[in-house]
Amino acid sequence: MGVTMSKLPTEREVLRCIYEMYESSYPGIPAGETRGDNDPYLSIDVKAVAEKLACKPELLFGYLYYHLDAKHRYKQGEGASVHLFALKVGEKRHGVNFPYLSALLANHDLEHRRQLWSVGLSMLALVLSAAAIVAQVVTAK
């Protein structure tokens, strides 16, 4: 049974979906320990995330690996690369740098709120302008 795609998910939608699906798993606490490992990477199930986003797993993998990781990858002072998404990190397959993903999502959410405020204020200005025109037309008669 294939996945029906209505539209491709946005970067914000992909990050939000992964965050919501795996937030309770971070940090991973091994049985018998009180503190989780200081490992920022969580293994994700690309197929499950794709299913939740109603897109094909192959497209989601490509989006994560070829676009988002390339877009957000950076080098630290020592030359080590920090990845958002890695094919394999230690024993983990399809590893996502969860703290980094969380920070990127927070920035996307902030930008989204700013855009909503801008659109809302623009709509309010438009309504007030229309009301002023109507008031002028009514009082001019």
Regions found by a protein language model. Name each.
Residues 43-44, 70:
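Zinc-dependent metalloendopeptidases
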Residues 46-50:
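A short acidic, leucine-rich amphipathic alpha-helix
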Residues 52-96:
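Extracytoplasmic/lumenal ectodomains and periplasmic regions of secretory and membrane proteins
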Residues 84-115:
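Juxtamembrane amphipathic/hinge helix adjacent to a transmembrane helix
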Residues 107-141:
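C-terminal single-pass membrane-anchor helix
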Residues 1-43:
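N-terminal extramembrane/targeting module of integral membrane proteins
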